[in-house]
A protein has these predicted regions:
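Acidic Gly/Asp/Thr-rich repetitive segments characteristic of extracellular carbohydrate-active
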Residues: 3-54, 59
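Solvent-exposed loop/turn tips at the surfaces of repeat/solenoid architectures
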Residues: 6, 56, 75, 85, ...
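N-terminal extracellular ligand-recognition/capping segment immediately after the signal peptide
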Residues: 27, 48-71, 77-85, 235, ...
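Right-handed parallel beta-helix/beta-spiral solenoid domain characteristic of secreted/periplasmic
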Residues: 70-121, 134, 139-146
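Structural detector of coil-to-beta-strand junctions
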Residues: 85, 112-123, 143, 157-161, ...
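Acidic/polar low-complexity surface segments
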Residues: 109-115, 140-156, 206-210, 283-294, ...
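Solenoidal tandem-repeat scaffolds enriched in leucines and small polar residues
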Residues: 142-161, 166-168, 172-218
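Intrinsically disordered, low-complexity segments enriched in Gly and acidic/Ser/Thr residues
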Residues: 268, 290-345
Length: 377
């Protein structure tokens, strides 16, 4: 039976239960079922198919692999809830698969592991162009990966993991990522992609704890854009470039970045950062502590041979400052450069342009705009 033009047709079972529908790119029906297990068992997805989920809650029996150009469409981020994880397994050649995930919530509580990685909500491998639009991602885990592993792909539980083999582009738009526990990141970039963009998106980690990250850049060359986006963390680093560099980071259009280090370049060199368009970068006390102090922007090394040099940070028509949630007991500089280890960071440029404001705390008589000192913890 060939059914044409079914995208706006509502399919129901005999008991009036709405069906999940799979549609081919030419508009014909692939399959429909009210039960996700039944649909996955009997459905063979083809290139450019669209799978439409009606309102409801659906539990994936296992990680859902997407190895073709596929669209997963819900009826709204507050109406369609998927519980489980998704693997976007892109192509191994130069032609990227085109994957879209739109209009739904993804709740995931992975199992704690002691070795290997803790399964991310969405993982990308291979060459894929991924769009996540109008979604909510709830990173509910209370477990961790292998916390002693120096690779954050395995040490952290990542909402979105762009793996070591990931290529192509990733765009996260009109989406909220909620971090609910320690040792989590919103987006971890561990591969070399053409572009990673967050647009009108929010990463919210306002819980006490440690080792949370908004955007964690762990690979060189991938350009990253943070556009009209809010990142709010109670601890650690909103945008953290660790052993990255030779790339462009753009923060623009009234993005609001607030955490224990809004931007931290750690053992990262040759990075070009441009903050513009009324954006705000705020350093604050960790977990509302009275003596934890850091900075809005930091550059540092940790006694390694990697270094942190030749970075250029341009701040244009934007705000850089500090915020204390509780009583202030320590001085806190808006911009901090660690000069305590060899090799000392050198040849870094910080350029203020336009109507930029750099603010310190009110009760310091001779505030320091740029501080040199020990590595932050």
């Amino acid at each position: 039976l060939e059914v044409l033009g079914v995208e706006n047709v509502e399919f129901k079972t005999e008991n009036e239960k709405p069906c999940i529908v799979s549609i081919h790119k030419n508009g014909t029906l692939n399959n429909a079922a009210s039960n996700l297990d039944v649909l996955l068992t009997n459905m063979i997805l083809e290139e450019e198919d669209k799978v439409i989920f009606p309102e409801g809650e659906y539990t994936l029996p296992m990680t859902l692999p997407l190895d073709k150009s596929i669209t997963i469409q819900g009826t709204g981020q507050d109406k369609t809830i998927i519980k489980g994880a998704i693997l976007v397994n892109g192509s191994a050649n130069n032609t990227a698969t085109d994957v879209k995930i739109k209009g739904l919530s993804i709740d995931y509580t992975p199992t704690k592991v002691t070795s290997g990685k803790c399964t991310p909500i969405i993982e990308v491998t291979g060459n894929a162009d991924l769009l996540i639009d109008n979604c909510i991602m709830n990173n509910n885990t209370q477990g961790y990966g292998d916390r002693k592993n120096p690779n954050p792909a395995e040490a952290l539980q990542n909402a979105i993991l762009l793996g070591a083999t990931a290529k192509g582009t990733v765009r996260v738009e009109n989406t909220t990522i909620n971090l609910a526990a320690n040792a989590q990141s919103g987006v971890l970039i561990d591969g070399e992609l053409t572009d990673v963009s967050l647009v009108n998106t929010k990463i919210d980690g306002q819980v006490n704890g440690s080792n949370q990250f908004g955007v964690y850049i762990h690979h060189k060359k991938t350009p990253v854009t943070v556009d009209s986006t809010t990142i709010l963390l109670n601890n650690h680093y909103c945008i953290y470039a660790n052993n990255a560099g030779d790339q462009k980071l753009t923060i623009k259009n009234k993005s609001n970045i607030v955490g224990y280090g809004a931007l931290y370049l750690y053992e990262t060199s040759d990075m070009n950062v441009h903050v513009s368009g009324g954006s705000i970068l705020t350093g604050k006390t960790k977990n509302k502590g009275v003596s934890d102090s850091f900075a809005a922007i930091a550059i540092s090394t940790n006694n390694s041979t990697v270094g942190a040099s030749n970075n250029e940070i341009v701040i244009e028509d934007s705000y850089i400052g500090n915020k204390f949630d509780e009583q202030e007991t320590m001085a806190m500089t808006p911009i901090k450069i660690n000069g305590s280890f060899t090799p000392t960071p050198c040849d870094n440029k910080i350029i203020l342009k336009g109507k930029t404001i750099v603010s310190t705390t009110d009760n310091i008589k001779n505030p320091t705009i740029v501080g040199y000192g020990m590595n932050p913890d």
